[in-house]
């Protein structure tokens, strides 16, 4: 995620504290960066950023087109948008597929999260991406009574 801003722009100044809070609260979960378009016009043009502040979320790398965030400039809203875009390598484990999960890739250790959440936690998504080559991540939701 990148914030494109100009240090002397009033709207950019308004978002600064919220973006800093976002970076602190989501440390280790989201990669958060910023580019001053006054200092680096070429980079801003490369990403087709012509007005500031602009927040762009990238899923895998900066080579993809990214998606512009157009919602509320409050750190929780921005974080919610970005975490929905995160890649996840977490398998949903059910009573029907748990054997396949444990038999898949026998050389890898398996991590299972038992949760009451209806969606995968951002930190678990981040861990699954970070360790996808070494570990298999699975999630068992509370509706899977047979597995609990």
What are these regions (language model features)?
Residues 1-148:
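ER-lumen resident redox/N-glycosylation machinery signature
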């Amino acid at each position: 995620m990148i914030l494109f801003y100009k240090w002397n722009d009033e709207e950019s100044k308004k978002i600064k504290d919220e973006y800093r809070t976002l970076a602190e609260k989501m440390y280790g979960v989201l990669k958060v960066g910023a580019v001053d378009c006054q200092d680096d016009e070429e980079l801003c043009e490369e990403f087709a950023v012509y007005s500031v502040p602009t927040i762009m979320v990238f899923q895998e790398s900066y080579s993809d087109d990214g998606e512009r965030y157009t919602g509320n400039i409050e750190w929780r809203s921005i974080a919610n948008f970005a975490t929905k875009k995160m890649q996840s390598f977490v398998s949903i484990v059910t009573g029907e597929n748990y054997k396949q999960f444990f038999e898949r890739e026998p050389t890898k250790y398996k991590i299972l999260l038992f949760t009451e959440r209806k969606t995968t936690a951002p930190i678990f998504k981040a861990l699954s991406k970070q360790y996808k080559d070494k570990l298999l991540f699975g999630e068992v939701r509370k509706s899977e009574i047979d597995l609990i």
